[in-house]
Amino acid sequence: MDSVYLRMVAALPATEGHVSNTATGGASANTLTPQVRSALAKVPAPALAIIQTVDNDIQCDAANVKSVGASVADALAVIHDASPNTKILVVGQLGRPSVTFVKDLVAHDATKKQGLTWDDDCTFYDAQGMLHEAGFRKLTAAIDAYEAETARVCAAVPNCATDGGVRRAWVDKIDLFSPVDDGHLNKQGQAAEAEQIWPVVQRLVGA
């Protein structure tokens, strides 16, 4: 897979071996700073630091937006204070809730509907099993609120940039996801994800 790291090494050979991934699946934003400190202990002056968070912090009413932003701001400050020349990329949520994708997903496996039915206004299906399109709009608005806040705190840190909406434009496709876990990309999906974000990385690090 032509990952961001492998693309970085090809474009900037001096970065080879200088890599650390301390991300943890399902982690919340308040774990970012410990992850950052762990990564910096292994690579004290990285050319690039990528921050990807929010997903597991999302609340339908976005009530915790400010606390998520504060967690991200703290992590960014730790990076910049330790390594002022490091370029920091804060990436957004991959894609947005899609009626088309969810319909396709449930058409392939009707049991998926249960996992897309929640007890809040962001549910994709109502209690009667009918598609609830207002839930897609509500969740999209919540995600946008989190990303606006993380973009705001990023803008206050030198050398920090967002992906500028590139990841927002991602379109979910069933064949890009794991057949046993539709919440995670397969190798093909991960390669597509890296390809999509690479131009943003190139501009940021001058590769």
What role is predicted for each listed range?
Residues 63-68, 138-142, 185:
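Alpha-helix N-cap and loop-to-helix initiation/capping positions
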Residues 33, 65, 69, 147, ...:
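Short, amphipathic alpha-helical "lid/cap" segments that border enzyme active or binding sites
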Residues 1-71:
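Conserved SGNH/GDSL esterase-like catalytic core that processes O-acyl groups on lipids
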Residues 56-58, 65, 70, 74-75, ...:
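Extracellular glycan-modifying ectodomains
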Residues 177-207:
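Histidine-centered active-site loop/cap adjacent to the catalytic His
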Residues 22-27, 51-56, 79, 91-95, ...:
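Active-site-proximal beta-strand/loop segments in catalytic clefts of secreted hydrolases
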Residues 99-161:
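Substrate-gating cap/lid alpha-helix
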